[in-house]
Amino acid sequence: MSEKTFLVEIGTEELPPKALRSLAESFAANFTAELDNAGLAHGTVQWFAAPRRLALKVANLAEAQPDREIEKRGPAIAQAFDAEGKPSKAAEGWARGCGITVDQAERLTTDKGEWLLYRAHVKGESTEALLPNMVATSLAKLPIPKLMRWGASDVHFVRPVHTVTLLLGDKVIPATILGIQSDRVIRGHRFMGEPEFTIDNADQYPEILRERGKVIADYEERKAKIKADAEEAARKIGGNADLSESLLEEVASLVEWPVVLTAKFEEKFLAVPAEALVYTMKGDQKYFPVYANDGKLLPNFIFVANIESKDPQQIISGNEKVVRPRLADAEFFFNTDRKKRLEDNLPRLQTVLFQQQLGTLRDKTDRIQALAGWIAEQIGADVNHATRAGLLSKCDLMTNMVFEFTDTQGVMGMHYARHDGEAEDVAVALNEQYQPRFAGDDLPSNPVACALAIADKMDTLAGIFGIGQHPKGDKDPFALRRAALGVLRIIVEKNLNLDLQTLTEEAVRLYGDKLTNANVVDDVIDFMLGRFRAWYQDEGYTVDTIQAVLARRPTRPADFDARMKAVSHFRTLDAAAALAAANKRVSNILAKSDEVLSDRVNASTLKEPEEIKLAMQVVVLRDKLEPYFTEGRYQDALVELAELREPVDAFFDKVMVMVDDKELRINRLTMLEKLRELFLRVADISLLQ
């Protein structure tokens, strides 16, 4: 069977830059699934994405589906005919579904009986006939949150569509996709190259688009070019470009023909905190800031034009003129804000609502101040500095700078606090209170910052759960999942001696009578333990290991982490599987028994050598392991408990637990309960698979 290259290109208006990659990847994944479901043999499916196009190129696509033999078994002969030999309704319905009559059906005889059978040779459908619907289906499944409709058409897509190119080899596949008749026409760059041209063969793509249309259709190629050219441009001025992955992706999604240029701004603006300048350059203008080797911001920036100009200096000057007013605004806000102390913004917090039922930002500040001080006392941080940081924590939200450049919250609080002469750990805490902001983000660097970050997040968790507005599905408007995971990461990775039970109770207490959910403490703890589950799954721990620890519901995060590591190590031991099975057996035996067990094992009642040996080892280990449990040495404890494998196996091989003798039965059940209690001091090992 011959093979050809297939090309589909959807030419559009400018696509959303932050969604461009996901649209292209989804298009490729959807179309690959369509090919596979149709049984069409194919080679690599390559995706292309530029601001005004999505495209796929499929190598070695078969020209038709393979022929196939199908068999459909019908009713058993006994049910297919009545006593007079006439076909039953079931047989006739089955035959009708196969497109035959009952008398045309074959019979299948096996050692289990005889059935009606339909066999057919189905010729594979041509690829040309299948492709239009496959493309349309793949586009319809794209993850588009908001669809557009344009003109008088009822067609919906992410942006208006102008061209649809469908080529199988050198042949146009006739189809109407998104209201556009397919053709071999491709549009080039808006201002360079040929605005429109035809493509003769799918194999010519994307080279023909580069040569005639001045468009680099390969997303990764554009991104790599921007990165390499920006690094070289920064090197030429003795600096290093801030090429964050997210901004690189966005810029690569904004240009079809990237041309990297270098510009500058007035050095006087460097007196403004670098974070505000960088926010303006990266967030508003999509520029790449440049840093000196010592990490200080240089008065330069790198940007990407979408055109090759005969006079690039004109483009550079234009961008310098655009950014200057924004930097001047930042300078003005910075100087204006410093005319009063950060603390002077406290009264204005009373005018901003945190949440209708939970009060204002000033109310939240008072709670954070108290909770940060309480946490500081628990973890050995400076209580006075923690309460001071709590008092000032939201003051920068009232400054001109943060009002205009919202992403500078926290960091501007730090700069203004330093200007006011606040303690350094207080100033740093104001910046780090929102950390970690995302997975893998840095944690607060000092104890005061840890106390403030935990207090801020716990106040939000307690308040929102306290009024019954916990996250539902994908909706999490107060970012409670991120807050919960942030608290857990700080406590675990900083090894802080905090208990979620008392921490949540204190956060709830500070709300007074504002909360309406009587189960708020348990709800918050359950939610946070659920975040533990997600965290450890991401870390590669097995679900049953997590469940084994969760079964004990440990509320000290650092303790939870120690148990996780202990159980994970226990699973590597030779005795693990046998002891997990034994624990499961013990758990089942105890669950089925309604006996009232004794507080201790009666040694004089023991009879069999195997139960005597096991009972003695349980007693010895109970005393030996008590310090291990107290000190959180769970891994050492489980290693010691692994030594019970042999006596436990011997016990179950030789000893009957549920004997008629009640005293003996209760004594053996008591011994098993004491055995299980030792393991439960760490985790429920019976849940391990």
UniProtKB/Swiss-Prot annotation:
PANTHER family: GLYCINE--TRNA LIGASE, CHLOROPLASTIC_MITOCHONDRIAL 2, GLYCYL-TRNA SYNTHETASE. Transmembrane segments: none annotated. It comes from the Bacteria. GO terms for molecular function: arginine-tRNA ligase activity; ATP binding; glycine-tRNA ligase activity; tRNA binding. GO terms for biological process: arginyl-tRNA aminoacylation; glycyl-tRNA aminoacylation. GO terms for cellular component: cytosol; glycine-tRNA ligase complex. Tetramer of two alpha and two beta subunits. Disulfide bonds: none annotated. Its EC number is 6.1.1.14. This is Glycine--tRNA ligase beta subunit. Keywords: Aminoacyl-tRNA synthetase, ATP-binding, Cytoplasm, Ligase, Nucleotide-binding, Protein biosynthesis. The gene is glyS. It catalyses: tRNA(Gly) + glycine + ATP = glycyl-tRNA(Gly) + AMP + diphosphate.
